[in-house]
C-alpha cells in the first residue's frame, strides 16, 4: 500500500467561501455538510433514493484525487484499479461493464463522459461528489443502468481562493497543483488550474529491469463564470489532460496454488492519452420555472502498446489506438415553486459520438501482422418527463418516463502484411459495413412518506436500459453486434434523523433483475468479445450513520452488501456459468 507525506500545502484566501450548508437539513449518506448543486435533483437529503454525498473538505483530508480513490468511501461502489487508465470499470450494486460503454454514468459539471477510456483522471477543484445508486435512466439516460456519479467543481462566482499543493510519498509519488479562483467584477469570475502527478510504479519487469506500471500525468483547466442578469448565469470551462503510463504489470497465474509469476516480458508496453473537454452551461432561475442548457465537446486520442503474451519470448505484440469525438446538448425545464403540490420536469438530450479504433497484432514467429480499423459513429436523442404530486402534506408519488433512440453504425476493415517487408505487403482480408438502431422507454415509479421533518420512508421501481452495439475485435461477421441489456430495480429505504439532527441514519434494500446482460469474454490472441449472457440478479443493502456529538466532531460509518450471480449463463454447449457469482463485484464494501 502506498504511503504519502504531505510536504507543503498553502491556501491563500482572497474571499470567503460564498456558499454555506443548510444545517437544518439532514444530509443522509453525507460525508460532510455540503450544498447540493445538481439541477435535476437539488435536495438529495429528502430525495427518495439511495445517495452518498462528499464535500471538498472530506476529499482533501482523505487525499481523494481521482475517480479510482472513491471506492474506499462510498458503499456498494467498486472501481477496479488494474492496468492502464484505458480500462476503468465502474460498478454500483454489481452493475457495471468491463470493456464496452460504462453502465454507471459519469458527469463532471453536467458534462457527460460516455467513453470508458476517459473517466480515470485527476480532477482539480472538486467542490462535491454525488453517487446515486440504482438506475437513473429516466433523468440521465445513456450509461446509467447501475447508477450515476456527479462531480462538481467550484464556480469563481461562489468561491474565491488560491490553493497550492505539493505532496510526496513512497514510490516517488509526487503531486504538484495550483488552483486559482477570482472575481474580476461583481458579475464575472475566472479560474485557472494546473496539476502534475508522477509515480515510479509498484511492479518491476524482471526482463527489462524497469518498472512496468509507472505513471506521469498533467492537466490544465480554465473557466469563466458570468452572471448576465440576476436570473441568468453562464459558465464556460475547458480542460486538457495528458497521461503516460507503463504497460500492464501481469504475470502467469497458477490456479492450483493461487499464485502469480512476477512481471517478466521482453517488450515494454506503454499507454498514452490526450483528452480535451469543453463545456458551456446556461442557468435560469425564475420565480415560476428553472431552465438549464448544457453544451459539451470532448476529444480524446490514445495509444497502447502491450506485450500480449506476457512472457520473455517473442510471440505476439499488440498496438491499439482510439480517437473519440463526442458532442452533446441537453435542455431541461422544471417547476420552481416548492410550496406547490405538483412538481414537474421536462427535458431533451442529443449527442453524436464517433469512435475510430485501430487494433494491430504482430505475430513474430509466423512473421505477419493483422491491422484492423473500426469506424463507429453513433448518434441519439431522448425526451424525458417527471411528475411528482403531493397527495397529502406528507405523502408524495412520482412518475418518470424517458424515450431514447440511438443509431449506431460500423465500418470495419481487416488487413494483413509481412513484418519483414512492412506495409508495402499489405493486403485486405475482410470488410464489414452495417448499421442498426435501438429505442426504449424507461419508466420510474416512486412513493415516499415524510413521517416528520427529518424522517421518511420510500419505495421505488425503476427500469434500466443500455443500448447494444458492435464488437471491435471480432474477425468475422458472425459475431459483430450485441443486443441491448435491461434491468428492473426494486428498492425500499428509510432516512431517519434523531437527537435534533445530530444522528442521521439511512437504510436501503434493493433487488435487481438483470436480463440480456452484456458480458465480456476473452478470446486468446483476439481480445475481448461482448455477448449477451442471459439472466443475472443482484440484491443487497446499504447502511449509513453519521453522528455529531460535539461541535467539530463527526463520526461516520457506511456499509454496503451485494450478492450478484448468474441465474442463467451458458457460454457454450459444454461450458456453463449458471449460479456463479458476477466478477468484479465485492460482497462487502
Where are these regions (language model features)?
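Short, acidic, small-residue-rich periplasmic hinge/interaction motif at the N-terminus
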Residues: 19-60
